């Protein structure tokens, strides 16, 4: 489950993510992974999906938007992250969701 989201909303997000072809793992990071989130915190997700392209990421983001949930989802493809500090943060505090 995603911390701070109602169980039904969290389940809807995870079910949608499970449908994505080529998705090997989903890691929650940021304030929700560290337990420091508040009601307006976004949901930071790092996707381990080497075969996905930016177009796929945009479509996945649009599908998440179609759920009409009140949170913003920040999606990152791990193989496209070029900021060493962000990768270190994800590896240090990340929580595998899928």
Explain the meaning of each model-derived region.
Residues 31:
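Conserved H-loop
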Residues 1-25, 34-39, 50-98:
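Catalytic core of pol beta-like nucleotidyltransferases
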Residues 44-47:
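Short beta-strand->loop micro-motif that forms the acidic, two-metal-ion catalytic signature
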């Amino acid at each position: 489950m995603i911390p701070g989201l109602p169980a039904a909303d969290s389940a809807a997000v995870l079910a949608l993510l499970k449908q994505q072809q080529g998705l090997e793992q989903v890691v929650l990071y940021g304030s929700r992974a560290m337990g420091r989130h508040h009601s307006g915190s976004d949901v930071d997700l790092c996707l381990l999906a080497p075969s996905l392209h930016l177009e796929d990421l945009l479509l996945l983001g649009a599908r998440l938007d179609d759920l009409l949930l009140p949170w913003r989802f920040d999606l990152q493809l791990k193989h496209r992250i070029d900021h060493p500090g962000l990768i270190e943060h994800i590896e240090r505090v990340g929580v595998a969701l899928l």
